Curated annotation (Swiss-Prot):
The RNAP catalytic core consists of 2 alpha, 1 beta, 1 beta' and 1 omega subunit. When a sigma factor is associated with the core the holoenzyme is formed, which can initiate transcription. Keywords: DNA-directed RNA polymerase, Nucleotidyltransferase, Transcription, Transferase. Gene3D superfamilies: 2.40.50.100, 2.40.50.150, 3.90.1100.10, DNA-directed RNA polymerase, beta subunit, external 1 domain (2.30.150.10), DNA-directed RNA polymerase, subunit 2, domain 6 (2.40.270.10), RNA polymerase alpha subunit dimerisation domain (3.90.1800.10), RNA polymerase Rpb2, domain 2 (3.90.1110.10). Its EC number is 2.7.7.6. PROSITE patterns: RNA_POL_BETA. This is DNA-directed RNA polymerase subunit beta 1. Belongs to the RNA polymerase beta chain family. The keyword Magnesium does not apply. NCBIfam families: PRK00405.1 (NF001616), rpoB (TIGR02013). One of its GO terms (cellular component) is DNA-directed RNA polymerase complex. One of its GO terms (molecular function) is ribonucleoside binding. It comes from Nocardia farcinica (strain IFM 10152). It catalyses: RNA(n) + a ribonucleoside 5'-triphosphate = RNA(n+1) + diphosphate.
Length: 1162
């Protein structure tokens, strides 16, 4: 029913070129042996398809019609649900229909620039009907601005790019469970009917073998009471459930006479305080389970119930029916009795078994369209109440649809979702892979999902049904482990929200190219072989018995005739990021997890370089991520510049593609595009015209290929530390550009308007040298911390004047108006070059918040070279911090004098079990050197013809689970091309004789040398290093604030104090607890003494001690300090003008704690 079919006609091919289907793709020699009959689907389809369904996009409607399903858009569906809205008497009604959109108001770029939301005006047709007179009034009503999805699956909300993450939730339906009672150790079974919205209905067999029911989580009562309340007589119950002693015993004990008594009994349990009547009890039960407004199973819930219980009622409603309840009770009784099958009312035989809630047949995905639809449903239901009230209060003659409707609840619900929902995330834009995986994320958290505190191990664990649907490797480390997943490469979400994966159909033992998409439930009924099972020329299995997967079982050997399906690709089970790890099959899963996650943290470098050793996934990932410019129509390149590429298409149309130049991403990395085509070049549709960040020739390029030696070196690479060559610093090999945005606004204050100006009090001309006449820094200026970016003054109010000044003011009638310098300055520890300025002003009709007259944004770019303390990583979870940067001449070098770029420690490999990094190093050397296979060796018999010879600097693809074998690596290492001196520097084992750069002597043992792909991660030491001398203090405790963002101090905690006490360092400890912390008077005096060169004065009483005294006083304990029988005043030594002294020294004693925005990642 749900299976999609794709028929591809092709036969086994020997072509080794990775990434077919993208014209102009760079050549990459592939070790792949297995032909994939199905191309990787669009990697952003989970977002774009779902949003297309929501708004009823024309291309989505065309695809739905082609599939043979009725194209009902999500918005039309929710409007149909709520219509008609009737008043309390039923005399008039309002019907909403035909949702449609006008053109979006501004382009994506303009929205980002001006802090707007990328949205289109949304209109519906509202029809008001007066049922008494038959009068109909129809009107088009504006429903607000509807946020639209960009071409790359994102939303722009208030100028920031956001992603709505898909949510993994338990599917509506009926679920059967089994547990063992702790006291009696008897089996107890239960059943739950879970709707999409509405009350739960729970049945259970307890340890006393009685069958009970709980309605809406209330008190348990016999199941026969519910059946009688539904109108069943005792005879009918006996006729239907006569086979079940459980129910017959319950019926015998049941003293409820008939339907009326049963209804009253249920009412008493559900509404204990209210007086029960037959009508109210009947309405209560009807509203709980049988009214569409109050109870909704959703299409998927109805499908799951019908499938589980074997009901085949055509056009069954989305509410519960008597048949559902009766079939659920019968299923539970038979399950408790230990039966294996049951004949459903329709004559269908269904298996009787308990459900696994973590199975992907019972968990579904709420994609972006459904999440927004649910939010609109909430907004419309709030609007419905307003409409009802207005119907009763307004004059019937004067009513129009527009006057009845208030769209504010709908707009507010949308705003709330996009702005504050856990599933609407600030987009991860560190690099194209990060943004792509962000859109393919599946989260079990969020409203209606799990909470990370309550989620147990079972729900986080890898499940066999995840195969081909959700990646078993890629998930965050930390509290969210297992609750966030990523869609596998070939997976797709079907109309019910279940994740499907494709399989090749096996017919009469022959593997065909016909592809079926199966859900986890459907796959459980079949026997599936893996993609790398050898086939003959006709597509039949070579082995008589082959390993397969079956429901609930480990891999087992079966006869080849029993196989129903075969995987379409070896990389079918992993996600995009995991599929980009070469030799994944040789890495431990924990390290592969780190490798997949760390690829998302790579920062774009000044010059990107595609990996020598790739997996063939790089091109497709980069193109689908949307950071490269892709040609739309075949034609000829007419004009190329740094800012745009113009293509004259074959049909005579001309299109210019604009480049993004040095834009700031959400994470502060640099997003820049540059053309890779030439004037006059022929380009095909789908060909990459320009590279973006982290791409080279249209392929994902997250790092650099560096010559690596794996060896210890003087202990400087102990514990994962890394030694780098100075060459990488000098030649900007690992240099990245980071762009910071600084913003300031000029507001109206109670004392007058703030002003952006060059005229700043008490500031020298040197400081103002880079400011223009408006007071804004010029583009191109080099700035460092403390420099003024935008000059601004704020009114201070009237000041106290001396009598003489007062007399002069009275004579000349001039007020003493003073201003404070509140200029925007470069924050502590930052520097760079000003690359952009945006000025928004109320005078220019820019849309600014209330009270703001002017807003200035300054963009400062910083070129960060690699340095000690920065974090580097490979793709196999092999991460480390740079411990030392050696001069190039001191680095170990090869026999031909080539110095290595990076030295990694051998200890980083064995216990971590990520051998993939060693194999990558060897294959990297092979690709860099080139190779030629001589003769006809045994190891090369499976290599495609084109792989027998390759020039130097060849890029290679080794796809996951279908890559280079160990014997091929050994053979190719022995077949590498010699250098210009005719030498092969690396032997068959991948090792070379290295020479010590300092002494020129060879090291006593051969060392593994090759090329490894190294990423520079976003954990940069410049963002983390922090020091403070004086700074802000907390208003309450008078102690320094904490953290780099607040320019805080280092916490000296309780245990650190113990350490000081243990060493008897009394004076150091006193200093730390007083003048370096909260001795308000003492710290000012110390600062003064340091400035003047005097001795440090005695510390005073810390503020926290005074707080302690106040707390004791609150307990009615008076604390006094006595000296020679006389009380000593604790406030002793308070300098009345210490505030003034501090001000003169330029320090602020009690700056309030600033609230800083923290970015949420992933």
């Amino acid at each position: 029913m749900l299976e999609g079919r794709i028929v591809t006609v092709s036969s086994r091919t020997e072509s080794p070129l990775a990434a077919p289907g993208v014209p102009g793709a760079p050549r990459r020699l592939s070790f792949a042996r297995i032909r994939e009959p199905l191309a990787v689907p669009g990697l952003l389809d989970i977002q774009t398809e779902s949003f297309g369904w929501l708004i009823g996009a024309p291309d989505w409607c065309a695809r739905a019609a082609a599939r043979g399903t009725e194209p009902v858009a999500g918005l039309a569906e929710v409007l149909a649900e709520i219509s008609p809205i009737e008043d309390f008497a039923g005399t008039m009604s309002l019907t909403l229909s035909d949702p449609r959109f006008e053109e979006v108001k501004a382009s994506v770029e303009e929205c980002k620039d001006k802090d707007l939301t990328y949205a289109a005006p949304w209109f519906v047709t509202a029809e008001f009907v007066n049922n008494n007179t038959g009068e109909i009034k129809s009107q088009t009503v504006f429903m607000g601005d509807f946020p639209m999805m960009t071409a790359h699956g994102t939303f722009v909300v208030n100028g920031t790019e956001r992603v709505v993450v898909s949510q993994l939730v338990r599917s509506p339906g009926v679920y059967f469970d089994h547990a063992i009672d702790k006291g009696s150790e008897k089996d107890v079974h239960s059943a739950r009917v879970i709707p999409s919205r509405g009350a739960w209905l729970e049945f259970d067999v307890d340890k006393r073998d009685t069958l009970g029911v709980r309605i809406d989580r209330k008190r348990r009562q016999p199941v026969t009471v519910l059946l009688k309340a539904l109108g069943w007589s005792a005879e009918r119950i006996a006729e239907r459930f006569g086979f079940a002693p459980l129910i017959m015993a319950s019926l015998a004990k049941d003293n409820v006479a008939g339907t009326d008594d049963a209804l009253l009994e249920i009412h008493r349990k559900l509404r204990p305080g209210e007086p029960p009547t037959k009508e109210s009890a009947q309405n209560l039960l009807a509203n709980l389970f049988f009214t569409e407004k109050r109870y909704d199973l959703a299409r998927v819930g109805r499908y799951k119930i019908d499938k589980k219980l074997g009901l085949r009622a055509p056009g069954a409603p989305r509410v519960l029916t008597e048949d559902d309840i009766a079939a659920t009770i019968e299923y539970l009784v038979r399950l408790h009795a230990g039966e294996r099958t049951m004949i459903a009312p329709g004559g269908v035989e269904v298996p009787v078994e308990v459900d696994d809630i973590d199975h992907f047949g019972n968990r579904r995905v709420r994609t972006v369209g459904e999440l927004i639809q649910n939010q609109i449903r909430v907004g419309l239901s709030r609007m419905e109440r307003v409409v009802r009230e207005r119907m009763t209060t307004q004059d019937v003659e004067a009513i129009t649809p527009q006057s009845l409707m208030n769209i504010r609840p709908v707009v507010a619900a949308m705003k709330e979702f996009f702005g504050t929902s856990q599933l609407s995330q600030f987009m991860d834009q560190r690099n194209p892979l990060a943004s792509l995986t962000n859109k393919r994320r599946l989260s079990a958290l969020g409203p209606g999902g799990l909470s990370r505190e309550r989620a147990g191990l079972e729900v986080r664990d890898v499940h066999y049904s995840h195969y081909g649907r959700m990646c078993p490797i890629e998930t965050p480390e930390g509290p969210n482990i297992g609750l966030m997943g990523y869609l596998s490469v070939y997976a797709r979400v079907n109309p019910f929200g279940f994740v499907e994966t494709p399989y090749r159909r096996v017919v009469d033992g022959r593997v065909t190219d016909e592809v079926d998409y199966l859900t986890a439930d459907e796959e459980d009924r079949h026997v599936v072989a893996q993609a790398n099972e050898p086939l003959d020329a006709e597509g039949r299995f070579l082995a008589a018995r082959i390993p397969v997967r079956r429901k609930n079982s480990e891999v087992e050997l079966v006869d080849s005739a029993a196989v129903d399906y075969m995987d379409v690709s070896p990389r079918q089970m992993v996600s995009v990021a995991t599929a980009m790890i070469p030799f994944l099959e040789h890495d431990d899963a924990n390290r592969a997890l780190m490798g997949a996650n760390m690829q998302r943290q790579a920062v774009p470098l000044i010059r990107s370089e595609a990996p020598i050793v790739g997996t063939g996934m790089e091109l497709r990932a980069a193109v689908d991520a949307g950071d490269v410019v892709v040609n739309e129509k075949a034609g000829v390149v007419e004009e190329v510049s740094a800012d745009y590429v113009t293509v004259m298409a074959d049909d005579g149309t001309r299109k210019s593609y604009r480049m993004r130049k040095f834009n700031r991403s959400n994470q502060g990395t640099c997003s820049n595009q540059r053309p890779i085509v030439d004037e006059g070049q022929r380009v095909e549709a789908g060909q990459v015209l320009a590279d973006g960040p982290c791409t080279e020739n249209g392929e994902m390029a997250l790092g650099k290929n560096l010559l690596v030696a794996i060896m210890p070196w003087e202990g400087h690479n102990y514990e994962d530390a890394i030694i780098l060559s100075q060459r990488l610093v000098e030649q900007d090999v690992l240099t990245s550009i980071h762009i910071e945005e600084h913003e300031i606004d000029a507001r109206d204050t109670k004392l007058g308007a703030e002003e952006i100006t060059r005229d700043i009090p008490n500031v020298s001309d040197e400081v103002l040298a880079d400011l223009d006449e408006r007071g804004i820094v010029r583009i191109g200026a080099e700035v460092r911390d403390g420099d003024i970016l935008v000059g601004k003054v704020t009114p201070k109010g009237e000041t106290e004047l001396t009598p003489e000044e007062r007399l002069l003011r009275a004579i000349f009638g001039e007020k003493a108006r003073e201003v404070r310098d509140t200029s925007l300055k470069v924050p502590h520890g930052e520097s760079g070059k000003v690359i952009g300025i945006r000025v928004f002003s109320r005078e220019d009709d820019d849309d600014l918040p209330p009270g703001v007259n002017e807003l200035v944004r300054v963009y400062v770019a910083q070129k960060r070279k690699i340095q000690d303390g920065d974090k580097l990583a490979g793709r196999h979870g092999n991460k480390g911090v740079i411990g030392k940067i050696l001069p190039t001449e001191d680095m170990p070098f090869l026999p031909d004098g080539t110095p290595v770029d990076i030295i990694l420690n051998t200890h980083g490999v064995p216990r971590r079990m990520n051998i993939g990094q060693i194999l990558e190093t060897h294959l990297g050397w092979i690709g860099k050197a080139g190779w030629k296979v001589e003769g006809n060796p045994e190891w090369a018999k499976d290599l495609p013809e084109e792989m027998w010879e390759a020039p130097a600097d060849s890029n290679i693809a080794t796809p996951v689970f279908d890559g280079a074998r160990e014997e091929e690596l050994t053979g190719l290492l022995g077949s590498t091309l010699p250098n210009r001196d005719g030498e092969r520097m690396v032997d068959d084992n991948g090792k070379a004789v290295l020479f010590d750069g300092r002494s020129g002597e060879p090291f006593p043992y051969p060392v593994a040398v090759g090329y490894m792909y190294i990423l520079k991660l976003h954990h940069l030491v410049d963002d983390k290093i922090h020091a403070r001398s004086t700074g802000p203090y907390s208003m309450i405790t008078q102690q320094p604030l904490g953290g780099k963002a607040q320019f805080g101090g280092q916490r000296f905690g309780e245990m650190e104090c113990w350490a000081m006490q243990a060493y008897g360092a009394a004076y150091t400890l006193q200093e730390l607890l007083t003048i370096k912390s909260d001795d308000v008077v003492g710290r000012v005096k110390v600062y003064e003494a340091i400035v003047k060169g005097d001795n440090i004065p005695e510390p005073g009483v810390p503020e926290s001690f005074k707080v302690l005294l106040k707390e004791l006083q609150a307990l009615c304990l008076n604390v006094e300090v006595l000296s020679a029988g006389a009380a000593v005043e604790l406030a002793h030594g308070v300098d009345d003008d210490h505030e003034r002294t501090a001000a003169n020294l330029g320090i602020n004693l009690s700056r309030a704690e600033s609230i800083t925005e923290t970015e949420l990642s992933g």
